[in-house]
């Protein structure tokens, strides 16, 4: 029999409950009020009293209301049908909720995440008599553009033998597709779907690898200077309006991955609506089908209950780990982890815990670290390799990178793409600061070359600061030329037009080709009689390079521009 209790205190979305029986941490419960059952999660246990965070508005809950515990942790349902879906933080399908409730979501309405009526064409890849363990494949169904493997549920801890398996055909997620038997002779029925707790990492693999293979985003500044590896982690901190969301959307469109999961936790609803409108219309260059076919969106906007923000982050990473177990490459984009941290701060305050810096909980760093640590590249039991790459945007107030959430994130991620107000105000997009950002991963271009090129940016910035004080006349022609070359590199290689059909996505071959052209210009010595002549010449080179960026790779226009560029360089270079 499930544990019962009654409400003895309400503070915002924190409810204190007196229980009769045993309760465990993170257990799901329902508060019965006004004819509705409101979902909540246990976050503290003290004797016969527990504190629970309610995932809904707590208006109307009063002392004495009955509470029923489920004896289950907060879980997600895993199975075919997750892709193309839009869920809230508790994995309720929002399109179905809209049909049931209309424009405004009602409290206490929870729907099944997966469609129980849809038939999936199952093709078996194992047979009766095979020995299996948790995570092994029984067969697959085609879901969008991926082979969705049907696996032995991850909570099965023993070794089993298949005693029954259905023939190829159409089945729903609740129909039995196999029966397995353990060593004691007990039989277990297997369907296409099962549940898994969101806060427990999925570890049914042989070993973890160190991320080394670059995950191409087709954004030049990232792939060349601040690369991200498959199975790695990165963060995009930046002030409001610096282009975090656009950069994440461009990355999700063009990244070299099989599946993209977008966790919109606490961001404005308008940005999510933009994604929902654009993604079905965008064509995936790898498959020629809609981008939505390989995307799952977990949407918990700023207008939804605060407590579900934390759940949305964990729901997203659990779905990502599930698809990783099929040998696929997953990209998870969390926008924004600051809102999740603010939700933690709110709950910590209500629990009357000792606050840390800026009133965030003292355990903020360990919680953020435990989330990013669930990224990784792994070797599965059958030898396949799957990865989850996690990118979180951070929204520090006023673009201050010294605040606790940014600092806690920087300690655990492998790449830092810092957006600055200075670059976004100058309309230099993507507004990633080439001086403050860094990456621990290997990129598509030789590191010796990139270090040499970055040195130009550093020198150019120093000369620019000097010019602000003494003016152009106060510096030598050689220094002015270094400054002009750094500006050429910035405008022609670091900046990219996300709304141009050609420049929005640049593959590694083109990146290498264009980088070599810019690299050779930087290494070439030029001599000019005065600064005006130098500026005119570099501006001419810059315009040629910008026109090349907007031309199809190696077509007649591109080749003509390249020929003109090389003639200009050869004419002015000092031998």
Curated annotation (Swiss-Prot):
UniProt KW keywords: ATP synthesis, ATP-binding, Hydrogen ion transport, Ion transport, Nucleotide-binding, Translocase, Transport
Coiled-coil boundaries: none
Residue intervals passing through the bilayer: none
Higher taxonomy: Bacteria, Pseudomonadati, Spirochaetota, Spirochaetia, Spirochaetales
Gene responsible for this protein: atpA
CDD domains: ATP-synt_F1_V1_A1_AB_FliI_N, ATP-synt_V_A-type_alpha_C, V_A-ATPase_A
Entries under SUPFAM superfamilies matching the protein: C-terminal domain of alpha and beta subunits of F1 ATP synthase, N-terminal domain of alpha and beta subunits of F1 ATP synthase, P-loop containing nucleoside triphosphate hydrolases
Family matches, as Pfam families: ATP-synt_ab, ATP-synt_ab_N, ATP-synt_ab_Xtn, ATP-synt_VA_C
EC number: 7.1.2.2
Reactions it catalyzes: ATP + H2O + 4 H(+)(in) = ADP + phosphate + 5 H(+)(out)
Protein name: V-type ATP synthase alpha chain
Keyword Nuclease (UniProt): no
Function, in words: Produces ATP from ADP in the presence of a proton gradient across the membrane. The V-type alpha chain is a catalytic subunit.
Domain of life: Bacteria
Native source organism of the sequence: Borreliella afzelii (strain PKo) (Borrelia afzelii)
Biological-process GO terms, alphabetical: proton motive force-driven plasma membrane ATP synthesis
Keyword presence, DNA repair: no
